[in-house]
Amino acid sequence: MALEKSLVLLPLLVLALLVLGWIQPSLGKESRAMKFQRQHMDPGSSSSSSSTYCNQMMRRRNMTNGWCKPVNTFVHEPLVDVQAICFQENVTCKNGQTNCYKSNSTMHITDCRLTGSSKYPNCAYRTSQKERRIIVACEGSPYVPVHFDASVEDST
């Protein structure tokens, strides 16, 4: 009797484990919109004048795990203002896609560039504060930024 119950429950247990195995990885996967926020948004701070800002932020935001990300830009504006860019001037992305948008106004940003002598795991970055219009790629529903494409001088 107990053996019969075990034989019935075993396939159900195996099925449950298989389903969890397929579902679980997608539960922990970071969406493109969340990755954009992690890698590029720092609205709580003004563009820091500290020369160590990029070194600290690149580590804190997990962009130096396994390699040194060569270039990254942090945006020091409210998230809603950056999300609004998705409904501003449509421009062609660097890769030729047509889902990029340029901000109507300049934004406070910090550019982080890997120094020439820097090697993993000792990633060292040069910090540059700028006021630039930014270009982001947008997708999804809701339509939100998923990629930082460029920053450009204000031409007005």
From Swiss-Prot:
The active site is at H40 (proton acceptor), H147 (proton donor). PROSITE patterns: RNASE_PANCREATIC (PS00127). One of its GO terms (biological process) is defense response to Gram-positive bacterium. It is found in: Secreted. SMART domains: RNAse_Pc. Disulfide bonds join C54-C112, C68-C123, C86-C138, C93-C100. Residues 1-28 form the signal peptide. Coiled coil: none annotated. Substrate binds at K35, R38, K69, P70, V71, N72, T73, K94, R113. GO terms for cellular component: extracellular region. One of its GO terms (molecular function) is lyase activity. Glycans are attached at N62, N90, N104. Keywords: Disulfide bond, Endonuclease, Glycoprotein, Hydrolase, Lyase, Nuclease, Secreted, Signal. It comes from the Eukaryota. Gene3D superfamilies: Ribonuclease A-like domain. Its EC number is 4.6.1.18. It catalyses: an [RNA] containing cytidine + H2O = an [RNA]-3'-cytidine-3'-phosphate + a 5'-hydroxy-ribonucleotide-3'-[RNA]; an [RNA] containing uridine + H2O = an [RNA]-3'-uridine-3'-phosphate + a 5'-hydroxy-ribonucleotide-3'-[RNA]. Monomer. Interacts with and forms tight 1:1 complexes with RNH1. Dimerization of two such complexes may occur. Interaction with RNH1 inhibits this protein. Belongs to the pancreatic ribonuclease family. Endonuclease that catalyzes the cleavage of RNA on the 3' side of pyrimidine nucleotides. Acts on single-stranded and double-stranded RNA. This is Ribonuclease pancreatic.
